[in-house]
Amino acid sequence: MTSLQSNVDSVSANYEEQQKNEITAIPSYGLKLKFDHVWPEKRNQNLRPSLRQTLPLVPLACRYAAYYWKVSRENRRCYMDYYYMENGKQMYGVPLGGIGGGTIGRGFAGEFCRFQMRPGMYEYNVVHANQFIVTIKDAKGCTIFQSLLSRSSSRSKQPLNTWHSNIDDSKCTYTGLYPRAWTEYDLTAYGVRLICRQISPVIPHDYKDSCVPCAVFVWSVENVCAEERKVSITFTFKNGTGTKKQDAEGGAEAVLITQGNMKGVGIRQKIAGMPCSYNLGCRVLPEISITRCTQFDPCGTGEQLWAELRENGQLNEKHCDEPLKTKDLGVALCAQVALKQNTSHDLEFVLAWDMPHIEFPKKHKTYTRYYTKYFDASGECGPKICEYALKYYNNWEKLIDAWQRPILNDDGLPDWYKSAIFNQLYFISDGGTIWLTCESSFGKELSFDDPRKAYGRFGYLEGHEYRMYNTYDVHFYASSALSHLWPNLQVSLQYDFRDAIDVDLLDTRKMLYDGKILPRHTKNCVPHDLGDPDEEPFTLINCYNIHDVNHWKDLNTKFVLQVYRDYYVLNELAQAQADNASKFSSIEFIDKDSLYEMYTQDNKRKNSADEKQQNRKSASLYINETNGKVYLMDAMAYLKAMYPACKAIMERSIEYDKDNDGLIENTKMPDQTYDTWVMEGPSAYCAGLWLAALQTMSVMATLLDQPNDCLRYQDILDKGKHSLEEKLWNGRYYIFDVHHKDTIMADQLCGHWYLKTCGFDYEIYPKENVRSALKQVYDNNVMSFQDGTLGAVNGFIVNAEPEKPGHVDYTTVQSEEVWPGVTFALAATMIQEGMFEEGFQTAGGLYKTLSERIGMNYETPEALYAEKHYRSIGYMRPLSIWSMQVSWERRKTLRD
């Protein structure tokens, strides 16, 4: 029995090791680059619109200049800064950190860059003091190689100029597949091969670990020569974010940290007045020697630390107090291991940051980050986070692999897509994202069954440069990712908008477009955004003051459509849980009428019978923190909570149908997401969204036993469907609007796309019309524009003589742009219709240009032009690529 048991244990251990190797292996797909990679094309934002495009915007430009001056005098930056725009750096890799606790960027060649520690505010600094350093000693103890593990650059007159990168950039290979990355260093000339595996805890359907602000670096060190090698990896880091004045004001001090089997070093400081600690940790193992330095000068030459490592391969903890020339402070953590020939070992490092409380410049309120629910808000949790990350990162990788592997192994999907679908998700964590605890909304305490009490408040920017939280007309596209991967965050966001719909904010502002003085927000309409992080988001909503968004024609309909889509997805996930419990192991579904008993028991609240009855409500969900279970929002409870707001905004939108034909009309003003591309009368875009919203309202009314509402919406819908065909269908496609009949709009089937994601079929758009319109868009907007290598141009004008080619619509800047988010949504629509080749060509041409030609990885812009330029780097809308995956999986189910 003993021998048999030994064999069983051996087989089991081998199997586990094989499984681990498969999970941690460098994937075949992802962004793959050498450190010396150079892209063939470099673009910028220095676009010069044509005279025709510029003239209508002259009054706006004058008002913007005055507004810009006013904001600058308040020591703030405009939420959309058109004078100082960032150009893409062609350097970024997978960013560090979970969701909502701040992020630190990484370059694909090893840099630490693009800090978002101040909530929603990006600092585009490359901090040279933040490095990994390798030191290799031979069997005699002589140092044979020492180098930075980042790309080489000349720094002869810069700080830390004695630190050198001696690696061969052509022999260093990066693979990025968000949220993980791998970097291979070929140091075989010195008998060593290194692989750094970077892991951030971003895990679908997980609401605990996904919020942890940290990243793990596993350095696999392999001795590939015939004699012993002693290898050290040193991790260095400085205070702050690379912004000199702010860093100097932070009052940085270093501390040694120890927690369980983790040793490390930390920096306590303030960033923009908010306490924050950086924590570097390493797993303690008998065969690893760990040494620490609590003070080196990041503004000096770096000679002392560099020479110490070269001499000893370790740090001298007794003499690590190098004098500081400035208020900047650097710390270092070194792990050394001895390797016999042909052996390997992992050195496990972690970087964690702890900024539990944040404020925005107006300082109306102090907010607490969501991760503190699982640690605490003391500001002393850095060591605990480090220990937690080192303990659980293997499990994170298992969950990430289980999520990604089915897509990576799907032979029906093109190779480029397997990189794009995951790497575009970078924006979920690195979109200026915040995830906060939430106890109130617009001054009112949340009820016990409000999902925000359990899942907090979620916000992400429209773009790194377009600094508005949860911009709703754009989130409409991007929400495909959130609703399918973190549906409870989508639900939480929707509750914020539901509350905002019911709020009047009557403080007035001048609209930059026409100079009118108008209120910030009026009741019964969906706000454009939830505020600027450089002002006071979630209180001062609608920071967008270019146009009067209280009368935009697409915001209300987009809220209604998202409500029904969320309901549909929640039901889908419930069914998936029933069919495959292991896939959603962190989810439990609650469909009880009330969870009040659970609430009072878990929180040990004592209530009288009257209080108990008064507070009893139909529950949506409740998180039981004592056992860590996570509940998914009940679909019907969600629908009930959202329906009154949906009804209110639909009644508001009905007013936009001036001629009672069942279609809302645009007003020859910028009144939808294409805010320079003016529509007049019924338009394919807004009318389509309106009819789709009517369709979903009719169904919601039926589900909630509201027959009168159902009949009302159905009557308007029937009228509108007839008008859509009569006024906007020309036999080949849906015209842009009734005054621009020759323009083919790439986004003309947006309403149909959303209905399909909600499980509808051809209730509004006849199948033959859909196929014909998609063919026209593909032939003209895609293949007749840059030969199909740049996605779909927004507008294309057909020639009056069909045999002659048409041309791009140059009416406005936006009509000649390609919007990646719209292109991905269009591709999803094609896949919905079984047009797989066309869909993947449409999206693939665009993605290959972004990743292979112009190097816009992990900073996808809002818009691209045919040549030379792009607009608004790091944008939310391209998350719509996840609607392609949803469409693919549903079509695959039909085929199977």
Give residue ranges: language-model regions.
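Solvent-exposed N-terminal domain segments of exported/luminal and surface proteins
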Residues: 11-20, 80, 85-90, 94-95, ...
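Short amphipathic alpha-helical coiled-coil/interface segments
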Residues: 389, 396, 400, 421, ...
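Extended glycan-interaction surfaces of carbohydrate-active proteins
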Residues: 414-463, 502-550, 607-608, 658-681, ...
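Helix-terminus loop motifs that line ligand-binding clefts
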Residues: 25, 118, 123-184, 489-670, ...
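Acidic/polar, glycine-enriched structural segments that form the non-catalytic walls/loops
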Residues: 4-73, 182, 187-190, 195, ...
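Active-site core of glycosidic bond-cleaving carbohydrate-active enzymes
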Residues: 472-476, 480-502, 558, 582, ...
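Short, solvent-exposed loop/edge-beta patches enriched in aromatic
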Residues: 95-111, 124-144, 177, 187-192, ...
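Alpha-helix capping and helix-loop boundary segments enriched in small/acidic/polar residues
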Residues: 91, 171, 203-211, 465-468, ...
